[in-house]
């Protein structure tokens, strides 16, 4: 959850900054000087949309360390840190990956992988997870995160987010232009759009961005199933991953809802649409039915 949530928040912030900068530079005024140029607007939306998404990808590892306070293990100071490094190294070798950075952070049972590429990645695990699971279960969680890197999930998420951003920016300006034209219908429409266009385009970007995250989260849930299967393949046994998921369920049952969400325990109803992880029982069932 942390990996996807941080990416989405960073992406939204970058998109808003780029959009605001474009307004200051007069790009929006150029696009609407003679009515709304749909072709130019689509090109602009794609440039900002994919640009913002890839900037977010490049910032992902730094943002993850900063936001969680994760401490990268450069030289192991105890047996547990040595075991973590060796386990990730072995899993990465099996996955034919360069050794990622390994970090520990304080928090509820959780782990995540992030980074701009397969060769520049980070695997982080919380102190809560290390305290509450046995090593076979922790190894399964680490294998799950290494599988995310092996599958190129951050790059895939970036491309999906780029497409989503493009449509969000495009539609936000189309709706804002239509709203501004309606509000100024009794005025001289020969000039550039009024202040209503600038304000409403930002509002539409935020609203459409939140709604569009449903699409991103849908693909994220699909990638979780694949990472679970990848973890089972790396370990050579699906049972440790199943036990790790069951442990997460028993640890979080009846506890803090936010911690449950962070660990991938999805709620029902509308909230399930905004969850980056499928329900644990669905993930366990998928592993148990795999051959």
UniProtKB/Swiss-Prot annotation:
Annotated gene: htpX
GO cellular component: plasma membrane
Keywords: Cell inner membrane, Cell membrane, Hydrolase, Membrane, Metal-binding, Metalloprotease, Protease, Transmembrane, Transmembrane helix, Zinc
Cofactor(s) for this UniProt protein: Zn(2+)
Residues that bind Zn(2+): 144, 148, 224
Subcellular location: Cell inner membrane
EC assignment: 3.4.24.-
Topology term for the membrane: Multi-pass membrane protein
Gene Ontology process terms (BP): proteolysis
Cofactor remark from the record: Binds 1 zinc ion per subunit.
Alphabetized GO MF terms: metalloendopeptidase activity; zinc ion binding
PROSITE patterns (alphabetical): ZINC_PROTEASE
Protein name: Protease HtpX homolog
Lipid biosynthesis keyword on record: no
NCBIfam families documented for this protein: PRK05457.1 (NF003965)
Keyword Thylakoid set for record: no
One Pfam family from the record: Peptidase_M48
Family: Belongs to the peptidase M48B family.
Transmembrane regions listed in the UniProt entry: 4-24, 38-58, 159-179, 199-219
Organism: Chlorobium phaeovibrioides (strain DSM 265 / 1930)
Domain of life, per lineage: Bacteria
List of catalytic residues: 145
């Amino acid at each position: 959850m942390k990996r996807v949530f941080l990416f989405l928040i960073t992406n939204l912030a970058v998109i808003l900054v780029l959009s605001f900068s474009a307004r200051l530079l007069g790009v929006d005024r150029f696009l609407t000087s003679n009515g709304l140029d749909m072709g130019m607007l689509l090109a602009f939306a794609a440039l900002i949309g994919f640009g913002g998404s890839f900037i977010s990808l490049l910032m992902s590892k730094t943002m993850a360390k900063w936001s969680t306070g994760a401490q990268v293990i450069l030289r192991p100071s105890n047996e547990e840190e040595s075991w973590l490094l060796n386990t990730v190294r072995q899993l990465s070798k099996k996955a034919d990956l360069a050794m990622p950075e390994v970090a520990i952070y304080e928090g509820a049972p959780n782990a995540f992988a992030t980074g701009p590429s397969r060769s520049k990645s980070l695997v982080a695990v919380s102190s809560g997870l290390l305290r509450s699971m046995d090593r076979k279960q922790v190894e399964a969680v680490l294998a799950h995160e290494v599988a995310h890197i092996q599958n190129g999930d951050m790059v895939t998420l970036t491309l999906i987010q780029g497409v989503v951003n493009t449509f969000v920016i495009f539609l936000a300006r189309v709706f804002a232009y239509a709203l501004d034209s309606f509000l100024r219908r009794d005025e001289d429409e020969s000039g550039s759009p009024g202040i209503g266009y600038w304000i409403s385009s930002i509002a539409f970007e935020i609203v459409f961005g939140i709604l569009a995250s449903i699409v991103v989260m849908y693909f994220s849930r699909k990638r979780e199933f694949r990472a679970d299967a990848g973890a089972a393949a790396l370990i050579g046994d699906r049972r440790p991953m199943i036990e790790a998921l069951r442990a997460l369920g028993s640890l979080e049952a009846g506890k803090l809802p936010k911690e449950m969400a962070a660990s991938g325990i999805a709620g029902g109803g509308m909230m399930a649409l905004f969850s980056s992880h499928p329900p644990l029982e669905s993930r366990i069932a998928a592993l148990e039915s795999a051959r």
